[in-house]
A protein has these predicted regions:
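A short helix->beta-strand "capping" segment at the edge of beta-propeller domains
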Residues: 6-25, 53-57, 192-193
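Structural hallmark of WD40 beta-propellers
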Residues: 36-38, 57, 77-82, 124-128, ...
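Beta-strand-rich domains and repeat architectures in extracellular enzymes and scaffolds
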Residues: 17-45
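WD40-repeat beta-propellers
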Residues: 48-51, 90-96, 137-141, 161, ...
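Terminal intrinsically disordered, low-complexity extensions flanking WD-repeat/beta-propeller proteins
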Residues: 3-10, 189, 196-198, 501, ...
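Short C-terminal beta-strands that terminate individual repeats in beta-propeller domains
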Residues: 18-20, 57-62, 103-109, 147-153, ...
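Conserved strand-to-loop turn within each blade of WD40 beta-propeller repeats
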Residues: 43, 82-85, 89, 129-133, ...
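Canonical WD40 repeat/beta-propeller blade segments in eukaryotic WD-repeat proteins
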Residues: 25-31, 66-71, 112-118, 156-163, ...
């Protein structure tokens, strides 16, 4: 047995082709650039710059953790982004040049979280607002990158900060139960504030918009109403909408050229409010609480982003919406391609299974099962059905074209079906549960019966694989064991032990060896003939390795895990040759497409990353040696 120590090799970076995802939880995080063609939004620690006409994506990488806020300057040249980090640590603000997609400057004074950012109308200054642990307002000079003045935002938590539209020394902040109007003295380098007089009215203010002449501000509250603020005399003027509130609160608000107000609520309602009498003129509904609205230059249409990570295209006049992009808004548990077909792939997570087009990255089909979570799924070898395991203990099989339920096997496992695999002929399904049971199901034309229940594991079963002969199954469990089962006679033939929680197991294409991985940060090679350990490789310095996938040639394999990196390893030498970066959350699964051209990975934040595979990994070395 050979133990290899971990030394960080120089691995080449993989080319990131596309990302399916959108962090809908970032307030005003979906921004349409002034050129009317570029859509900007965050995914984890990256910023996606997408051309809405060609759907070409470019990526801005520089943050070390999830992005918390975005803003674009009036000229469209600059983009400022802030991130969240850990308690007590500094959170970065990055200033980007959108013409070159490069970093202009990096500001690091705030702690834990950047709550809000705003540019002055002339692109000279940037104001930043820290989160609840910081609560400071800092004004930065863009040309020099230096902070000019700083002040605490007050005792209440501040939600948003904005520059006036025609002045670079006037700032407004909205906070719990108040609004402050700030004046910046650039000569003395200090900031002073005036509180807006609300009288006896108390509201928790979440968002605001300032009119083009800087006379009034309109703010949305957690109570679900809108307040008009006179910025000249710092006093509250009126309240609306008349005879109607939005119970869960107003997340974002926009001002139309005719002075009508456009608002988005936490319950998914888009409403247009008449400026004169504050009555609702039009109303629409989208899926998920509205967190972003970004208008086109003509204001005839706007993009709308929601908490459920959906992006809608909405007509301003009628408020009729059509969905343009969608993705998982919670962790993705599994990903698979159909057998020898790379045109589509499937993912599963909370409440649904989704089928995606590989080329367009659009959702083809969504199989929705409310209030439960899908832990695992796969396509039958013949492509005629999708079988899946859920946390209610059922195995459900669906038709791949319509998503219609074909059959369900009830009470398969007490606390959920956590791993599942079918034989190549589709006549048997082997499932594993949260409590460690392995059960074999016979699948007939009209019936599904349990053949046997094998109780050897004492912890959750994370992975099951079946060999090409359909007579052996290997299960990996959190109890530190991998068991090889004879699924003809239903007996245990061998057992592998390690001090780890096994996360996944894969066969080498020749089925002479198997690879295992888990929480011990290692990838272990095992011989199938006598089930002895061949060697163990330190695969990461951080967390566990959660997933493995083999290339068809058997000369390379892919790993991914808590270190948020996708790594391509050379099988014989156990050296990582390539790595894919971009994920900001632990990666749950990774898979190589059947055509060997792309690698797909899914993570805890619901994003799907698609990397291009290097040419040298697509063709086996033995094929390169063949005469042409």
């Amino acid at each position: 047995m050979n133990q290899q120590t971990f030394t960080q090799p120089k691995a080449q970076n993989l080319n990131l082709l596309a990302v399916i995802g959108f962090n809908g939880g970032v307030i005003d995080g979906l921004i349409l650039h002034p050129d009317n063609e570029t859509l900007i939004f965050p995914i984890g620690s990256q910023i996606v710059v997408r051309n809405v006409l060609s759907r070409q994506d470019r990526f801005l990488k520089g943050h070390t953790n999830d992005i918390s806020t975005l803003t674009v300057s009036n000229s469209g040249r600059y983009l400022a982004s802030g991130q969240k980090t850990f308690s007590g640590f500094k959170a970065d603000i990055i200033l980007w040049d959108l013409t070159t997609l490069s970093i202009v400057n990096r500001f690091s004074i705030h702690k834990f979280l950047i709550q809000s950012l705003s540019f002055s109308y002339n692109d000279k200054y940037l104001v930043s607002l820290g989160g609840i642990e910081d609560n400071f307002i800092i004004v930065w000079e863009i040309e020099t990158g230096k902070p000019l003045c700083c002040n605490t935002a007050g005792s209440d938590f501040v939600h948003q900060v904005k520059f006036f539209n025609n002045s670079d020394n006037k700032i407004v902040t909205c906070q719990n139960f108040g609004i402050k109007i700030w004046t910046v003295d650039y000569i003395e380098k200090k900031v002073s504030s005036v509180d807006v007089n609300f009288g006896n009215l108390k509201r928790k203010i979440l968002c605001m918009i300032i009119d083009p002449k800087d006379k009034f501000a309109y703010v949305g509250t957690e109570t679900g109403d809108i307040l008009e603020i006179d910025l000249q005399i710092a006093i509250y003027k009126r309240i609306g909408p008349v005879k109607r509130l939005f119970p869960q609160g107003i997340n974002c608000i926009k001002l139309l050229p005719n002075k009508d107000l456009l608002l988005g609520s936490k319950e998914g309602i888009i409403a247009k409010i008449n400026f004169n009498d504050f009555r609702i003129k039009k109303e629409g509904k989208v899926l998920g609480g509205v967190t972003s609205m970004t208008l086109t230059t003509e204001c005839a249409y706007f993009f709308c982003g929601t908490e459920q990570s959906n992006i809608y295209w909405v007509e301003t006049a009628s408020l009729k919406s059509e969905i343009r992009n969608t993705c998982h808004n919670d962790r993705v548990n599994d990903i698979h391609f159909p057998y020898e077909y790379s045109g589509v792939f499937g993912t599963c997570g909370k409440e649904d299974i989704r089928i995606w087009n590989t080329e367009t990255r659009q959702e083809h089909l969504r199989i929705h099962v409310p209030n439960i979570e899908c832990y695992c799924f796969d396509f039958m070898r013949d492509g005629k059905s999708i079988y899946s395991g859920w946390n209610d203990g059922k195995i459900r099989t669906f038709l791949p074209q319509s998503g219609k339920l074909l059959y369900a096997i009830n009470e398969c496992h007490a606390n959920g079906v956590t791993a599942i695999c079918a034989t190549s002929d589709g006549r048997k399904i082997v499932s594993g549960g949260m409590n460690g049971e392995i059960r074999v199901w016979k699948i007939g034309n009209q019936s599904q019966t349990m053949e046997t229940s094998l109780k050897e594991h004492r912890g959750r079963v994370f992975s099951i694989v079946i060999n090409s002969q359909n007579d052996r199954a290997v299960s990996a469990s959190a109890d530190g064991s991998c068991i090889i089962w004879d699924i003809i006679n239903y007996v245990r033939t061998a057992c592998l032990f390690e001090r780890t929680l096994f996360k996944q197991i894969v066969y080498h294409p020749e089925e002479s060896q198997i690879l295992t991985t888990g929480t011990n940060k290692k990838i272990t090679y095992w011989d199938v003939t006598d089930y002895t350990e061949i060697r163990s490789v330190d695969a990461t310095l951080e967390g566990s390795v959660n997933s493995l996938s083999m290339f068809n040639s058997g000369e390379f394999f892919v790993s991914a895990g808590d270190d948020r990196e996708v790594k391509i390893w050379e099988y014989d030498t156990s050296i990582p040759r390539f790595k894919g970066l971009g994920h900001s959350n632990p990666i749950n699964k990774v898979i190589v497409a059947p055509n060997q051209e792309i690698i797909c990975s899914v993570s805890e934040d619901g994003s799907i990353f698609i990397f291009a595979t290097p040419k040298e990994t697509r063709v086996a070395k033995r094929d390169l040696r063949k005469p042409q």
